[in-house]
Amino acid sequence: MSALILDGKSVTKKSEEDLRSRVARLKELSNGAVPILATILVGNDPSSATYVKMKSNACTRVGMDSLKVEMSEETTTEELLAEIAKLNANPNIHGILLQHPVPPQINERQCFDSIDLSKDVDGVTCWGFGRMAMNETSYGSATPKGIIRILEAYDIQLEGKHAVVVGRSPILGKPMAMMLLNKNCTVTICHSKTVGLDKIIKTADIVVGAVGKPEFIKADWIKDDAVVIDAGYHEGGIGDIELQPLMSRVKAYTPVPGGVGPMTINTLIYQTVEACELKLAQ
């Protein structure tokens, strides 16, 4: 049996074609204005700078603009809050991304929660998470929302399925579980300290690896015909799941790289365009 490859690059390419049309339409309706994503980079972390550049490039590909705000390593919580307040008040900014991580002297949660809900296109505020958990309108955290979009693009059945999410981070594991629950999955949330993890995963129709440890989830823990989503990425191009032995016996899987990663950035852009459309409709 050959497993279905859930190709995030392919889904992203199709999404970008649609987003280009939507941005062009917004430009017509707003006298040349286009959606703008503001990214805030605090400090000198090279990986963060790379991610911000990738997001800027994604904006360009669909005809959007991006505004990069760079702040020093010595930035205080108060200074960052003031910058976010300016972006909240700017009517030309439709989405705000605070690149994680920030320097240790900054209260990251306080800064995340200061982002206006209508501009929280990365789905990082507690208020947004609460609305999402209650199945109310909100912007989902970009990675789990991207995973849902991949599953829907390939018509993977979710309703009635048992999904095991391995990981409990506030921007991935927890929102992933809530989104799957909202799609009528029966959801079990596990983590690296779960007792009997292998036995629990063996019961899963859908496995989401979001634990942040390379190949932590072993291939023989996963049953035949499962759908395998690997949200991890580590040095050497491996994820959180031991994928290689699974490729011939599971129903479908996301490759690493090229699966979840492209959809995370695309979802950020997708939700920024959506925010602009909603504002224009008001």
From Swiss-Prot:
<keyword id="KW-0521">NADP</keyword>
<dbReference type="GO" id="GO:0000105">
    <property type="term" value="P:L-histidine biosynthetic process"/>
</dbReference>
<dbReference type="GO" id="GO:0004488">
    <property type="term" value="F:methylenetetrahydrofolate dehydrogenase (NADP+) activity"/>
</dbReference>
<comment type="subunit">
    <text>Homodimer.</text>
</comment>
<comment type="pathway">
    <text>One-carbon metabolism; tetrahydrofolate interconversion.</text>
</comment>
<dbReference type="GO" id="GO:0006164">
    <property type="term" value="P:purine nucleotide biosynthetic process"/>
</dbReference>
<dbReference type="InterPro" id="IPR020630">
    <property type="entry name" value="THF_DH/CycHdrlase_cat_dom"/>
</dbReference>
<keyword id="KW-0028">Amino-acid biosynthesis</keyword>
<dbReference type="InterPro" id="IPR036291">
    <property type="entry name" value="NAD(P)-bd_dom_sf"/>
</dbReference>
<dbReference type="GO" id="GO:0035999">
    <property type="term" value="P:tetrahydrofolate interconversion"/>
</dbReference>
<comment type="similarity">
    <text>Belongs to the tetrahydrofolate dehydrogenase/cyclohydrolase family.</text>
</comment>
<keyword id="KW-0554">One-carbon metabolism</keyword>
<keyword id="KW-0560">Oxidoreductase</keyword>
<dbReference type="GO" id="GO:0009086">
    <property type="term" value="P:methionine biosynthetic process"/>
</dbReference>
<dbReference type="InterPro" id="IPR046346">
    <property type="entry name" value="Aminoacid_DH-like_N_sf"/>
</dbReference>
<comment type="function">
    <text>Catalyzes the oxidation of 5,10-methylenetetrahydrofolate to 5,10-methenyltetrahydrofolate and then the hydrolysis of 5,10-methenyltetrahydrofolate to 10-formyltetrahydrofolate.</text>
</comment>
<dbReference type="Pfam" id="PF00763">
    <property type="entry name" value="THF_DHG_CYH"/>
</dbReference>
<keyword id="KW-0511">Multifunctional enzyme</keyword>
<keyword id="KW-0378">Hydrolase</keyword>
<dbReference type="InterPro" id="IPR020867">
    <property type="entry name" value="THF_DH/CycHdrlase_CS"/>
</dbReference>
<keyword id="KW-0658">Purine biosynthesis</keyword>
<keyword id="KW-0368">Histidine biosynthesis</keyword>
<dbReference type="GO" id="GO:0004477">
    <property type="term" value="F:methenyltetrahydrofolate cyclohydrolase activity"/>
</dbReference>
<feature type="binding site">
    <location>
        <begin position="167"/>
        <end position="169"/>
    </location>
    <ligand>
        <name>NADP(+)</name>
    </ligand>
</feature>
<dbReference type="InterPro" id="IPR020631">
    <property type="entry name" value="THF_DH/CycHdrlase_NAD-bd_dom"/>
</dbReference>
<protein>
    <recommendedName>
        <fullName>Bifunctional protein FolD 1</fullName>
        <ecNumber>1.5.1.5</ecNumber>
        <ecNumber>3.5.4.9</ecNumber>
    </recommendedName>
</protein>
<feature type="binding site">
    <location>
        <position position="192"/>
    </location>
    <ligand>
        <name>NADP(+)</name>
    </ligand>
</feature>
<dbReference type="GO" id="GO:0005829">
    <property type="term" value="C:cytosol"/>
</dbReference>
<dbReference type="InterPro" id="IPR000672">
    <property type="entry name" value="THF_DH/CycHdrlase"/>
</dbReference>
<keyword id="KW-0486">Methionine biosynthesis</keyword>
<dbReference type="Pfam" id="PF02882">
    <property type="entry name" value="THF_DHG_CYH_C"/>
</dbReference>
